[in-house]
């Protein structure tokens, strides 16, 4: 495995900022995936680290990175435009390091939603997008759905979703939103919450993240590798 920790420069209205990034690749990867953290976590959160390690075991190179607000150690995300600009810089870096591999944009909760907005605006053009717990709406407030942009995304999308996720209730609303997408699937995690925790099961965050990787890899193989 190869690893690099070179920061990424992001162009923001107030000037360029540098964000931390960790690129790790297995021997002979068949895809490269940028993995964004959620709003309340960082690039080194155990869930994200575990998921990335398991993806590499599946043959996928990974690039974990920080959004500018997290790099500045602020708790609340900045403007969406800053996150979208970060996604643009991250995918450019991933393309430089991936040697012609298919590029995938993925993220936990907020990080995935920002990837979807960047794709909908044409700022990034990944081969596919993967959402780990897409935040359909704030918990208990389904009237504030964050889905109007999803039909504009041309790329295939995979939504990994817990059936007990409070950000997705009622599930019928989430299913209806995904049905408006051009090309999208839901992979349900039975009993899973927003971070895919399951009541009555004690698992470390690294393990929870790692257990999602086989579903992600299988879906990506079906979408990115031509059948013979």
Regions of interest found by a model, annotated:
Residues 8-102, 195-204:
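Serine-hydrolase catalytic machinery in alpha/beta-hydrolase-like enzymes
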Residues 48, 146, 155, 168-177:
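Short alpha-helix in the alpha/beta-hydrolase fold that links the catalytic acid
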Residues 87-155:
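Primarily recognizes the serine-hydrolase "nucleophile elbow" in alpha/beta-hydrolase
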Residues 153-154, 159-161, 165:
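Short beta-strand/loop motif that positions the catalytic acidic residue
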Residues 164-168, 194-195:
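Acidic catalytic loop of the alpha/beta-hydrolase fold
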Residues 179-197:
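Catalytic histidine neighborhood in serine/cysteine hydrolases
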Residues 192, 200-228:
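Catalytic active-site module of serine/aspartate enzymes centered on a nucleophile-bearing elbow/loop
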């Amino acid at each position: 495995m190869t690893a690099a920790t070179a920061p990424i420069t992001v162009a923001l209205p107030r000037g360029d900022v540098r964000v931390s990034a960790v690129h790790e690749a297995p021997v002979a990867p068949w895809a490269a995936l940028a993995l964004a953290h959620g709003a309340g976590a960082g690039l080194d959160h155990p869930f994200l680290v575990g998921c990335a390690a398991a993806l590499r075991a599946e043959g996928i190179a990974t690039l974990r990175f920080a959004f500018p607000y997290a790099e500045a150690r602020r708790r609340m995300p900045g403007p969406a435009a800053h996150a979208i600009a970060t996604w643009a810089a991250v995918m450019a870096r991933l393309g430089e390091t991936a040697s012609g591999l298919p590029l995938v944009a993925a993220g936990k909760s907020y990080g995935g939603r920002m990837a979807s907005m960047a794709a909908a605006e044409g700022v990034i053009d990944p081969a596919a997008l993967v959402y780990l717990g897409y935040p359909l709406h704030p918990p208990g407030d389904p009237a504030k759905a964050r889905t109007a942009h999803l039909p504009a995304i041309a790329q295939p999308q995979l939504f990994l979703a817990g059936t007990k996720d409070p950000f997705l209730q009622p599930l019928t609303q989430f299913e209806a939103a995904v049905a408006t997408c051009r090309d999208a699937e839901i992979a349900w995690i039975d009993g899973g919450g927003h971070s895919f925790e399951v009541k009555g099961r004690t698992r470390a965050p690294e393990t929870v993240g790692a257990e999602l990787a086989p579903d992600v890899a299988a879906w990506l193989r079906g979408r990115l590798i031509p059948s013979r």
